[in-house]
């Protein structure tokens, strides 16, 4: 009957949610293990990247004349805080500048909200300040998407607007407009899959970030 169908659909939805969360956790732990040497490294890097896969996939050794320590992991801000920052996995965390980029994974989650994402990202900013008080923190805005059913640009714009006006203790770097095509979507000159950046995309990202550092 109707009640049984509703109960089944609710259970199915909950099981899917649990499976997604378990998959994210497994992926996070695998990447953290892979990056363990980078977390432990004693380095004179002037810039540290903390964020999801768009930062993690950026193959760059120097940015604006400073050595880069890339600690990007394809997870949410919440998991980054719980699995990496709070346990203080990052040793020798002395970079003068820290660049953050989070949010694109959050908007694929059921029930997400700009306020909740902002609170999670603010918690990361506050934790970075505790561990590296002299660091200047920069937060990169989300880039647009194209050809994706799991993300839409209305959500991206809404989140960018909220984060840029509510985060504190960080310098916001807007990226959205520079990556859009004439239709307001991610220009596919800069991406092969509609979310992640390709070589040309990273060239543009380097230019935009360097101008603000």
Q: What is the meaning of each model-derived region?
A:
Residues 23-30, 207-213:
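Conserved catalytic region of serine esterases and O-acyltransferases that act on ester linkages
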Residues 1-25:
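Conserved alpha/beta core of the MobA/IspD/sugar-nucleotide pyrophosphorylase nucleotidyltransferase superfamily
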Residues 144-213:
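Catalytic His-Asp segment of secreted/periplasmic serine-dependent ester chemistry enzymes
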Residues 26-123, 146-158:
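Conserved SGNH/GDSL esterase-like catalytic core that processes O-acyl groups on lipids
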Residues 124-128:
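Hydrophobic positions in alpha-helices of CheY-like receiver
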Residues 101, 140-141:
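Alpha/beta-hydrolase-fold catalytic nucleophile elbow
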Residues 8, 82, 114, 118, ...:
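Short, amphipathic alpha-helical "lid/cap" segments that border enzyme active or binding sites
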Residues 132-136:
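A short helix->loop->beta-strand "cap" motif at the edges of active sites that frequently abuts
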């Amino acid at each position: 009957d109707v009640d049984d169908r509703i109960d089944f659909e609710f259970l199915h939805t909950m099981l899917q949610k649990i499976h997604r969360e378990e998959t994210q956790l497994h992926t996070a732990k695998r990447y953290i293990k892979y990056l363990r040497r980078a977390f432990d490294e004693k380095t004179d890097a002037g810039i540290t990247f903390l964020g999801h896969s768009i930062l993690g996939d950026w193959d760059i050794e120097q940015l604006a004349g400073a050595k880069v320590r890339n600690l990007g992991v394809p997870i949410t801000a919440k998991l980054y805080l719980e699995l990496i920052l709070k346990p203080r996995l990052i040793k020798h965390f002395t970079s003068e500048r820290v660049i953050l980029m989070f949010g694109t994974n959050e908007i694929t989650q059921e029930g997400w909200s700009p306020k909740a994402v902002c609170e999670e990202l603010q918690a990361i900013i506050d934790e970075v300040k505790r561990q590296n008080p002299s660091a200047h923190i920069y937060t990169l805005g989300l880039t647009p998407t194209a050809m994706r059913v799991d993300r839409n640009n209305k959500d991206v714009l809404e989140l960018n607007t909220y984060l840029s006006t509510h985060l504190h203790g960080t310098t916001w770097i807007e990226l959205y407009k520079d990556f859009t095509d004439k239709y307001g979507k991610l220009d596919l000159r800069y991406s092969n899959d509609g979310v992640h950046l390709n070589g040309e995309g990273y060239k543009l990202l380097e230019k935009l970030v360097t101008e603000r550092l």
